[in-house]
Regions:
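Beta-strand signatures of extracellular beta-sandwich domains
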Residues: 230-232
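N-terminal propeptides
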Residues: 19-215
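Solvent-exposed strand-loop boundary residues in beta-sheet-rich modules
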Residues: 235-237, 267
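Sec-dependent N-terminal signal peptides of Gram-positive bacterial secreted proteins and lipoproteins
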Residues: 2-30
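Aromatic/hydrophobic beta-strand junction motif of beta-rich domains
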Residues: 214-223, 296
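Solvent-exposed serine/threonine-rich low-complexity stretches and specific carbohydrate-binding patches
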Residues: 239-252
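Short proline/glycine-enriched turn/loop motifs at strand-loop junctions of beta-rich domains
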Residues: 222-228, 268
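Short, aromatic- and glycine-rich surface loops/edge beta-strands on solvent-exposed regions
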Residues: 257-295
């Protein structure tokens, strides 16, 4: 499933009615916005971004060597760094003193190593890389679409390039270079950033709400240049009344059957956070942020 984009309010309304998706989100909010002007070449820009953010590293000779096939240990280290993982659990496959042991213990506790044959020196294929991505991102976007291989699902989602022309689109055995990995990891870093920012604004909005004399009163957060925020009220005849960044409202509850909070990336309309309010009097909210698959 490709990432859904906000095109029409009516399309959003349909998506929100699918049902709640509840998942834990880290409370940490990244400090730096995504405003750096990088090279137009995706690989070069992604490498620069990875080095700047500190989730990929150069070799001892001072070179990045983007042409080299990435190892399991390198990719797992990047995932652990992006997730900001601190706690671990035993990984008996690695001996005491092994350079990757502490990192793998953190990855193990977070579920990143589920169904993974532990071998830090292993050169990764697309399928092996995609499995690690989906394991690492389960707290944010749920499980992959069961109708695809890991490779097929990640290509369809838009985080991995398809095979070159003339080959099966979802070919699983192709190698993943360090430059390829940098592109994937930047998308993950950015996705985590926007999800956490969306959660921050969703909570700010929720705390602004109050019910007074049959009216729902609240204020849409001002947001920032990256996140566009919309609050939509749905009337009983399915019309939509909307409010945007920084706007306040006082709406008569009996005129509406539900309300949605929608936070999207203003650059590509990808969905950062969605909450559905079905009972406006009680202010109960259910998370409906887009998942890798709506069917688990």
């Amino acid at each position: 499933m490709k990432r859904l984009h906000v095109i029409l309010s009516s399309m959003l309304f349909t998506a929100f009615m699918v049902g709640p998706m509840i998942l834990p989100i880290s409370e940490a909010i990244a400090a730096e916005p995504l405003t750096a002007n990088y090279s137009a070449t995706p690989e070069k820009g992604a490498v620069e971004f990875a080095l700047l953010k500190g989730y990929m590293w150069k070799y001892a000779d001072g070179q990045f060597h983007g042409e080299k096939q990435i190892t399991q240990g390198q990719f797992v280290s990047s995932l652990v760094t992006i997730r900001g993982l601190k706690d671990g659990e035993p990984v008996p496959q690695l001996p005491q003193g092994h350079w990757a042991k502490a990192t793998y213990e953190r990855a193990q506790k977070a579920g990143i190593l589920t169904d993974v044959e532990i071998n830090p020196d292993k050169l990764l294929t697309k399928e092996e890389t995609a499995l690690l991505v989906f394991n690492a991102w389960k707290p944010y976007r749920g499980v992959k679409d069961k109708g695809f291989t890991n490779t097929g699902a990640l290509v369809t989602w838009g985080w991995m390039d398809p095979a070159p022309p003339g080959q099966p689109k979802f070919r699983e055995d192709l190698p993943v270079t360090r430059s390829d990995a940098a592109v994937i990891l930047r998308k993950m870093w950015q996705d985590k950033y926007e999800i956490e920012l969306g959660e921050k604004y969703a909570l700010e909005f929720h705390k602004s709400l109050k019910v007074v004399d049959g009216y729902l009163i609240g204020t849409v957060p001002k947001g920032d240049k990256l996140i566009n925020i919309t609050v939509q009220f749905y009337t009983k005849d399915n019309k939509i009344v909307g409010y945007g960044n920084g706007e306040s409202f006082k709406s008569k509850i009996e005129s509406f059957h539900s309300m949605s909070f929608i936070a999207t990336n203003s650059l590509d309309s990808s969905i950062a956070a969605v909450y559905q309010y079905q009972n406006l009097s009680l202010l109960e909210r259910k998370k409906n942020t887009q998942q890798f698959s709506f069917i688990e």
